[in-house]
């Protein structure tokens, strides 16, 4: 009798734990596995260089600025008549970012941009649309900067589940 009572209590406790655990949402971020990725060693080299040198500082600032301004999904520099000095600073930041990208090896442009976007994302609390804009900017920078051999970076832009 005691064994049956114990089994019933254990089964009820297990059901309660499973029900309670299913209430929570989890966002999981996957990193590419260097072992299964044929260009894994190159990616490791790019990542090490990015971490060692902290490359792409101007690009990180540009991504953050673009996200904060809340512009459309297109990457552009609109004429800001109210703040021409701000537009000039943004243009200088853009030129510095493009110069930083031109110094990268072509194979490392997209991986280092992805790392830079991730670093910007982790620097502060951003709304989902801001995070999307950070990655959108990073993805299209090679094209906008006219980087040889690179057009648009093939990495995915993070999506966030709807809670409504």
UniProtKB/Swiss-Prot annotation:
Pfam short name (any one): Tryp_alpha_amyl
Maturation-removed propeptide residues: 22-37, 74-83, 163-164
Keyword Transcription: no
Signal peptide, first to last residue: 1-21
Swiss-Prot/TrEMBL keywords: Disulfide bond, Seed storage protein, Signal, Storage protein
UniProt xrefs under InterPro entries: Bifun_inhib/LTP/seed_sf (IPR036312), Bifunc_inhib/LTP/seed_store (IPR016140), Napin/2SS/CON (IPR000617)
CDD domains given in the database record: AAI_SS
GO molecular function: nutrient reservoir activity
PANTHER family with a match to the protein in the record: 2S SEED STORAGE PROTEIN 1-RELATED (PTHR35496:SF20)
Oligomer and partners: The mature protein consists of a small and a large chain linked by disulfide bonds.
Misc remark: This is the most abundant isoform of 2S albumin in Arabidopsis.
Protein's job: This is a 2S seed storage protein.
Family listed: Belongs to the 2S seed storage albumins family.
Protein name: 2S seed storage protein 1
The encoding gene: AT2S1
């Amino acid at each position: 009798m005691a064994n049956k009572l114990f089994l019933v209590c254990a089964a009820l406790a297990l059901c309660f734990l499973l029900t309670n655990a299913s209430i929570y949402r989890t966002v999981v971020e996957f990193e590419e596995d260097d072992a299964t990725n044929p260009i894994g060693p190159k990616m490791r080299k790019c990542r090490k260089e990015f971490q060692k040198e902290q490359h792409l500082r101007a690009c990180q600032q540009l991504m953050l600025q673009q996200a904060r301004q809340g512009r459309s999904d297109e990457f552009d520099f609109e004429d800001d008549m109210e703040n021409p000095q701000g537009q000039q600073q943004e243009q200088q930041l853009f030129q510095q970012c493009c110069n930083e990208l031109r110094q990268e090896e072509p194979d490392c442009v997209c991986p280092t941009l992805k790392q830079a976007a991730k670093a910007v994302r982790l620097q502060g609390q951003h709304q989902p649309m801001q995070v999307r804009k950070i990655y959108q900017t990073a993805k299209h920078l090679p094209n906008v900067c006219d980087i040889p051999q690179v057009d648009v970076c093939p990495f995915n832009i993070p999506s966030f589940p709807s809670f409504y």
